[in-house]
Amino acid sequence: MGYVVSTFYRFVHLSNYYDIRPVLKEFCVQNNIKGTIILAEQGINATIAGSQNSLDKFFSFLDLDSRLCNLQYHKSFSRCNPFSKMKVKLRKELVCLGIEDFDDSVGGEYIDPENWDNFISRSDVYTIDTRNSYEINFGKFKNSINPETNCFRDFPDWAISWAKNKIDDDPIIAMYCTGGIRCEKSTAFMKDLGFSKVYHLKGGILEYFKSTGNINNLWEGYCFTFDDRIIVDDKLVPGDVKCILCGAHVMLEDMKSISRGHVLCFSCKDHV
């Protein structure tokens, strides 16, 4: 039996997010849904996996709450369930940029996946990857800028430095991330710095793969995922990765550690 992997987020005021946690956890456990859901006063962010029937029930359950109804989600498939358990976490921020004194309510404009290739191929557009270095090491869009960050909280310092040294007075900026949520905040931060022409890939890399299949080959390599698939190609098929210690190929069934993109086989894990 195959599994459906669903990623989604929504920025919405959830004053009772503490109370939502046990309800969602119980529903997911009862319906054999596994993954991670993050709740904050700012909204919800999640990647979950289960049968198609279970996920249909889950989104119907969310529809009962007007704040969470009609969620748009990205869907892919996995031969094995990429999660071992169900976690529902509470956070102060839905996605932590580490900067509080800026207006994060107005982000950049969306670029649909179908129009993304033409947009970033323009000579007057600066394409910025908002992900971390360990993610970018697996793959990226051609000629995109790597901020070389270790975590998302490092992005503001890089952005401030880049703004001071920018080549153009008012550059056109295109930004992207895995599923879109980090761009909601990072584009808002760029606009807060004074940039006016800020855009981002709607739905992120995963939606781009699903919608375009990387038809123009502007994506190079794999996309890192925050689950046991570790990486997927432009057809959303999990790829093979190598153990960082011995170099042996590590298949999905043998995954032992995916901490920050570092993969260990069973043998090496036992000796660390």
From Swiss-Prot:
Its EC number is 1.14.-.-. SUPFAM superfamilies: Rhodanese/Cell cycle control phosphatase (SSF52821). InterPro entries: Rhodanese-like_dom, Rhodanese-like_dom_sf, TrhO, TRHO_N. One of its GO terms (molecular function) is oxidoreductase activity, acting on paired donors, with incorporation or reduction of molecular oxygen. The keyword Plastid does not apply. It holds the Pfam family Rhodanese. PROSITE patterns: RHODANESE_3. Keywords: Oxidoreductase, tRNA processing. Residues 121-217 form the Rhodanese domain. The active site is at residue 177. It catalyses: uridine(34) in tRNA + AH2 + O2 = 5-hydroxyuridine(34) in tRNA + A + H2O. It is an enzyme of class 1 (oxidoreductase). One of its GO terms (biological process) is tRNA modification. Belongs to the TrhO family. Catalyzes oxygen-dependent 5-hydroxyuridine (ho5U) modification at position 34 in tRNAs. This is tRNA uridine(34) hydroxylase.
